[in-house]
């Protein structure tokens, strides 16, 4: 079965709906299958943003031109693998140019609403976080739901000479210090999501991070993001999360249509019955639509 066949399978249960409503719902479901997530990544220079992206995503990279002068400090890259893609937005680091921090705050406020998720990357051994804290409470609070903190370069945490290069794992003492750092970041920022700890260059901690990241994404974004992950990171639990997210997003299409249109009660009953059948089918054909 191919992607078109998967979508055709979703059409069959819709046949009992009036044509206009059926077309509306089908179009919105098709939009879900073509959705392009937008993920922001921020952090000071040297935090390892590029290495983290390379560790997570496999898609072919191409720059996205932006003619808007107000976003001249923002770099956009499209990652494409197969029929799906996502956009990475590289946001300017805070606290590195005091004269422009106010400008950056305004920039973030403009851009954050369009992002599905922001990965805020912090070096595991970075102790100068007061500016980050000020920026978080000064500009990012309304968007907490979209922010996932990532402690990167776990291999640099002291005692760094104890990092096991053979197994790419931290020593017991490093693990203890990483837990302390994780707790310190949690206490400082009070994030809504768990703080992730990784070494992107060593490939340590990224599976756990991906699991957390998938839980933080809106339902519409989980499946297309899963298509861009390196194969070893697109585990069955991750695929299951994405499959369920797609089902939830499809269900929401029906819920929105039912609540926003003036429909007679008998038709609403039919919509709910069709909804359950289509959501079940969406989960069943998920692999053919996205992989």
Give the residues covered by each predicted segment.
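Alpha-helix boundary/N-cap detector
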Residues: 1-20, 172-176, 180, 237, ...
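Switch II of P-loop NTPase G domains
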Residues: 71-74, 91-139
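P-loop NTP-binding site
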Residues: 198-201, 209-217, 230-291
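Short glycine-/polar-rich loops that comprise or flank the Walker A/P-loop
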Residues: 84, 113-118, 143-147, 190-194
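Canonical P-loop GTPase G-domain recognition
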Residues: 155-227
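Conserved G1/Walker A P-loop phosphate-binding module
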Residues: 1-91, 95, 281, 288
């Amino acid at each position: 079965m191919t992607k078109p066949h998967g979508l055709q399978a979703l059409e069959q249960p819709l046949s009992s709906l009036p044509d206009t409503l059926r077309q509306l719902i089908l179009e919105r479901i098709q939009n879900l299958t073509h959705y392009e997530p937008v993920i922001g990544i921020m952090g000071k220079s040297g935090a390892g943003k590029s290495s983290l992206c390379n560790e997570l995503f496999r898609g072919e990279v191409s720059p996205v031109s932006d003619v808007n002068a107000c976003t001249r400090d923002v770099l956009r890259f499209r990652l494409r693998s197969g029929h799906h893609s996502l956009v990475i937005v590289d946001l300017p680091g805070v606290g590195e140019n005091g004269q422009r921090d106010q400008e950056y705050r305004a920039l973030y406020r403009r851009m954050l609403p369009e992002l599905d998720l922001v990965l805020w990357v912090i070096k595991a051994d970075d102790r100068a976080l007061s500016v980050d804290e000020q920026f978080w409470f000064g500009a990012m609070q309304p968007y907490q739901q979209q922010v996932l903190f990532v402690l990167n370069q776990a291999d640099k945490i002291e005692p760094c000479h104890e990092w096991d290069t053979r197994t790419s794992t931290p020593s017991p003492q490093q693990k203890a210090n990483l837990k302390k750092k994780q707790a310190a970041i949690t206490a400082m920022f009070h994030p809504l999501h768990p703080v992730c700890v990784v070494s992107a260059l060593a490939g340590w901690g990224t599976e756990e991070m991906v699991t957390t990241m998938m839980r933080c994404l809106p339902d519409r974004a989980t499946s297309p993001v899963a298509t861009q992950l390196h194969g070893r990171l697109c585990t069955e639990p991750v695929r299951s999360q994405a499959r369920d997210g797609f089902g939830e997003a499809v269900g929401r299409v029906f819920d929105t249509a039912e609540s926003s249109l003036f429909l007679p009660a008998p038709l609403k009953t039919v919509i709910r019955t069709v909804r359950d059948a289509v959501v079940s089918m969406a989960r069943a054909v998920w692999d053919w639509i996205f992989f």
